[in-house]
């Protein structure tokens, strides 16, 4: 279960293809392969555009495309961070993330919890939108860069 949550954390970074080879981040190649496979599965399943994702990261704007919303849901679902009732469980990442960012994660969980939407895709999107509103700097500069 811990590996599954850690893989999700990596998935966010890999999702945006932002891990530079010179960053010094050592990631198990097996995990990268697994995450990329799940990323492709979610891209194929939802029809989300890699170009739209890349542009959103570059411009720090969360796209409102239904496919992107469902892509977020798919990734959260694949890594066990959203349950069958569409409740987010970001706090599960505390098991695998460095202690120095626990306070930030707890702040996001406390401030946002689960932002209910009309369905799972919309719930994932609204919750991520809240995370960005509460601590966009952390989401865009720390999470996305680490996972990229």
From Swiss-Prot:
A single GO BP: courtship behavior
Top-level taxon in the UniProt lineage: Eukaryota
Gene Ontology cellular component terms for the protein in this record: extracellular region; extracellular space
Deletion phenotype: RNAi-mediated knockdown in males results in reduction of aggressive display. RNAi-mediated knockdown in females results in a significant reduction in sexual receptivity after exposure to the male-specific pheromone cis-vaccenyl acetate (cVA).
Induction behaviour: Expression is inversely regulated in male and female in response to the male-specific pheromone cis-vaccenyl acetate (cVA) and is dependent on the active neurotransmission of cVA-sensitive neurons to second order olfactory neurons.
CDD domains: PBP_GOBP (cd23992)
Cross-referenced Gene3D superfamilies: Pheromone/general odorant binding protein domain
UniProt keyword annotations, A-Z: Disulfide bond, Secreted, Signal
Entry GO MF terms: odorant binding; phenylalkylamine binding; pheromone binding
Residues in the signal sequence: 1-23
Disulfide bond sites: 42-74, 70-121, 112-130
Tissue: Expressed in the antenna, mostly on the anterior surface of the third antennal segment. Expressed in auxiliary cells and the third antennal segment and exported to the sensillar lymph (at protein level).
Compartment(s) of residence: Secreted
Entry-linked Pfam families: PBP_GOBP
Function statement: Odorant-binding protein required for olfactory behavior and activity of pheromone-sensitive neurons in response to the male-specific pheromone cis-vaccenyl acetate (cVA). Modulates social responsivity differently in males and females, regulating male aggression and female receptivity respectively.
Family (UniProt): Belongs to the PBP/GOBP family.
Protein name: General odorant-binding protein 69a
Organism the protein comes from: Drosophila melanogaster
Phylogenetic lineage: Eukaryota, Metazoa, Ecdysozoa, Arthropoda, Hexapoda
Primary gene name: Obp69a
């Amino acid at each position: 279960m811990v590996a599954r949550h850690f893989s999700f954390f990596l998935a966010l970074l890999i999702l945006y293809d932002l891990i530079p080879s010179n960053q010094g981040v050592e990631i198990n190649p097996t995990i990268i392969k697994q995450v990329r496979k799940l990323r492709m599965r979610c891209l194929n399943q939802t029809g989300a555009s890699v170009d739209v994702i890349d542009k959103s990261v570059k411009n720090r704007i969360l796209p409102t495309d239904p496919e992107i919303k469902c892509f977020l849901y798919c990734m959260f679902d694949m890594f066990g961070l959203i349950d069958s009732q569409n409740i987010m469980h970001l706090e599960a990442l505390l098991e695998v993330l460095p202690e120095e960012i626990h306070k930030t994660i707890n702040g996001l969980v406390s401030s946002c919890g689960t932002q209910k939407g009309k369905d799972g895709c919309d719930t994932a999107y609204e919750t991520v939108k809240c995370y960005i509103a509460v601590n966009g700097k952390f989401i865009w500069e720390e999470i996305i860069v680490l996972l990229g």
